[in-house]
Amino acid sequence: MNRRQLLRGSVAVSAAAVLPRAADAQSGTALTFSPSYVRELARALATKPFAAPDEKLPEALKNLNYDQYRSIRFAPEKALWRAEKLPFEVQFFHRGFFYKNRVDIFQVADRSVTPVSYRRDDFSFGEGLGQWPDADLGFAGFRIHAPINKPDYYDELCVFLGASYFRVVAKGQTYGLSARGLAIDTGESKGEEFPVFKAFWLEKPAPSASSMVVHALLDSKSAAASYRFTIRPGQTTVFDVEMALYPRVDLEHAGLAPMTSMFFFGPNDRKDFDDFRPAVHDSDGLSIFNGRGEQLWRPLNNPHDLQVSSFTDVNPGGFGLMQRERNYLAYQDLESSFETRPSLWFEPIGDWGEGAVKLFEIPTKEEVHDNIAALWQPKQPLTAKSEHIFTYRLHWGADAPRADALARFTRTGIGSRGDDSKLFVLELTGDRLKGVDPKTIKGVVTAEKADISNIVTQPNPATGGWRLSFQCSVKGQASIELRAFLAQNDAPVSEVWIYRWTP
């Protein structure tokens, strides 16, 4: 078992065992859906005592190993809306293995709510799984398919499976990092709380629809919430998210728009790794457009000890965990194809006030572990027994949706210059640097508690960009905060590179 599987499947979090009014739907009583339907369920759920999720399963399913669980497959021809040839269709995940929590799924058509029923015949089962009586087991999650690459083939577009995790791809991409509905107490000594999506409502799309709407009900010990996801696939897949949060207790460390990724090693951090591949990561950096108009780039690390970075802000412009390196030769992994992993950009809608972008870098010795997390944490606690509304967009694609007015950093390389110093070599690209007089470009580098020397800026004819290099004294330092950018006539012409060096 690894951390990625643990976080997405086996999180022992409680959720209310019974959905308000869900029993009516399952008994055949017609329910009418409205825009506030799930929001009212979340509001009501937050007023009730917290109850554990339904994990009841036959022993044969509860004790499945990884390979046995993977042998259970949903029949594609049974996909929801397949027969109607709609622009989206849905397949479902069986419960078992780490995915024991029951997730209720409903279809919304013409404002009428009907449950999506579990049918054993919709699945094929591998050999040696044992026997269990027929019963309504519900589902573990679902995935949406759409013709994003070819008009005649429905590719997997997104997956909702495990806790409040979901993964998404755009055209030509493969799964990489994940988003979550909500994070609570990430990085706190008392331990993190993992909310769960306990029910979904899938709006039936029109035959000509270019988007699909999914509603979700989230629950945890500390809060309940509703979500409305409007999913628009394409060259970049966009999620419009409307969230209504109802805390049961004051949330001092709420993580909004949380995202989770993996950084094993790269050109800036190859120590301790004997591997034929030059780099292994789902994301290589955190990009931030802050409320002061700065454009920041923070390369990721796989540190020896947990590292938490906080970037305070007011009304952020956006942030994201990005996979900037898109060249196969940078990875040379034929199976994982890290160059096709999506970047994920968070775009706030409206006034988000004071808070901080938080970055968590967790040590890992295996690439199967998700060890990177980023989120927005409001400065003020989210008060109990109140409604907190958040609206934002998530952009899954090759890059951030914002135009880069400034040159940006594309590679961070670090090498030793003896025991006392490190050589940093930073590559940049961007139209802002094309055709400029090299004599007018200056590298600006600062460091806390360390001396900087040999700052050199020069065009890089091999890339068509620029290179900034410098040396930094590191002797006796537990960590060093570094900051660098290129300037012309004292005005920035590049984003700001920020980095925490650790031994």
UniProtKB/Swiss-Prot annotation:
Q: According to its UniProt record, where is this protein located?
A: Periplasm
Keywords of the record, alphabetical order, are: Periplasm, Signal
Q: How is it modified after translation?
A: Predicted to be exported by the Tat system. The position of the signal peptide cleavage has not been experimentally proven.
For this entry, list what GO says about its biological process.
beta-glucan biosynthetic process
**One GO cellular component, as annotated:** outer membrane-bounded periplasmic space
Which pathway is this protein assigned to?
A: Glycan metabolism; osmoregulated periplasmic glucan (OPG) biosynthesis
- What are the boundaries of the signal sequence? 1-25
Molecular function in Gene Ontology: carbohydrate binding; catalytic activity
Q: Which family does it belong to?
A: Belongs to the OpgD/OpgG family.
Q: What does this protein do?
A: Involved in the biosynthesis of osmoregulated periplasmic glucans (OPGs).
Name this protein carries in UniProt = Glucans biosynthesis protein G
Please report the organism this UniProt entry assigns to the protein: Bradyrhizobium diazoefficiens (strain JCM 10833 / BCRC 13528 / IAM 13628 / NBRC 14792 / USDA 110)
Organismal lineage: Bacteria, Pseudomonadati, Pseudomonadota, Alphaproteobacteria, Hyphomicrobiales
**The encoding gene:** opgG
